[in-house]
């Protein structure tokens, strides 16, 4: 008899019940690993699968996470370059792609990443045909559109991480300015995740008090408090971090876990995420942009109708036109 047999008395054969909350992260770069760790620390899955083409890096990351298994509630952490390891995932987070270089615009990355997606997306669909697909790779709005097209999934099951992080950055800076916790500072950044994002100044509030009623020039020229600079700091935030440490990881990882939590726990929370906005706010083309959306079990269930000022709507349409200009040139 083996030690195990002497130690453990078998009462019944275990039923092979699959994972109920399996999450896959594709890409074990800085963003992928920060997302994976954030998901594990929030205890959001009963199985985590990691996939990457770089086998040694993947193997090392999986082992490193497994060695911390004692401190986690997720008992199964697996990884492979073969997508069969991702089978029956509930949520698949795609962070893989060419990394943004210092000074490179997110739009410049596009075709490099489209080619990578042509391999990744069909493999995800093959093994997890019912999953919710969350795209994080940049430029996220265009790549969410690409993932939607390549997957053949209905629109509610393809979500881009969008401006969830931009809005968090905005609320953080707003909190610094007002000496308040970010959760008490309400403000939404919508549109493109990137240079043409739109701050909805008309909705910025603390405890229901509209800041624009207190300061009618807020966000406009001639504002003595220069709130416009807050949005500029949001846009420049990623570039600044990349310049200083070479990449961004922690905040986007936490943002991803925040979105995954709303899905797997069916929270019906509202997040600014990237979805198909054709027909909304005067957008005529098939583009994905961030608007406030409700996330739950089935993915993206509802979109909130924002009351935008004409100027804000104009910026959103301009954003959409920029993205469409790039999208129509893509070879899918």
From Swiss-Prot:
Subcellular location, record wording: Cytoplasm
UniProt keywords, alphabetically: Cytoplasm, NAD, Oxidoreductase
Protein's UniProt keywords contain Oxidoreductase: yes
Recorded GO MF terms: L-lactate dehydrogenase activity
Source organism superkingdom: Eukaryota
Reactions mediated catalytically: (S)-lactate + NAD(+) = pyruvate + NADH + H(+)
EC number: 1.1.1.27
EC main group: oxidoreductase
Residues involved in substrate binding: 106, 138, 169, 248
Subunit structure: Homotetramer.
Similarity field: Belongs to the LDH/MDH superfamily. LDH family.
Name used for this protein in its record: L-lactate dehydrogenase A chain
Species in which this protein is naturally found: Sphyraena lucasana
